[in-house]
Amino acid sequence: MINLTNIKEYKDNKELLKEIKEEFKNSSDLIIKTIKDIDVIFLESLCSSDKINEYILKVLSLSKKKIKDLNNILVGPNTKKIKSKSEITNLLLNGFTIVLGNNWYAVETKGDLVRSVTAPTTESDLHGPKDSFNESIQTNLGLIKRRIKSPDLVNIDMDIGLYSKTKVSIIYISSIAEVSLINKVKNKLNQINIDGILDAGNIKQLIGKENRSAFPTSQLTERPDKAAADLLEGKIIILVDASPLAISLPS
């Protein structure tokens, strides 16, 4: 975790940026932009790009003078000053964008994922959440991260398919999942040699095609709450871009 050091004890923001990168080194959606010596940091899967542009990037770009006080130009409706580094991890995991200048600020830029999703159609639950995965891998990652707010939640991206270059994300909780299972899944995905991947079913079929006795079985799910529950049990989730289903293994 980022330590409790107060902002006043740091001469610049380089050390803080280094610590943030280290803590979220396994989060492929961590984005860092620098505009006029101001650092802007956010988790892409949890944030609205429109809000970031409107509240932060646009005003930084339009400012003609050197920015001395961020509080005078940030326009987000929920903007707070950060006093210590211990706040940053939780803010990032809750959809805030961190802005680092002479002072540190957090601007709420949470994406409205609910409008992007619909209720489950094949795995309905009268008492469960009414959201389901859709065809956007970024939205689906955000739906999981909304439920598990920890830097231990790892997501590693890779492209599979000679022509399709389909984005695939391996997700697990590093402090819970077994290393042997993680390595087995990574190796299996790296061995896939195919022209194109069109949905999660293709991946499920390919990773279970050989060595059935050595590789655990998997199942498909359309529910983010089910995927989150499986992650908390040490399972691995695989998301495939353009597919509204996630792969959970072992089943």
Where are these regions (language model features)?
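Membrane-embedded alpha-helical signal segments
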Residues: 1-251
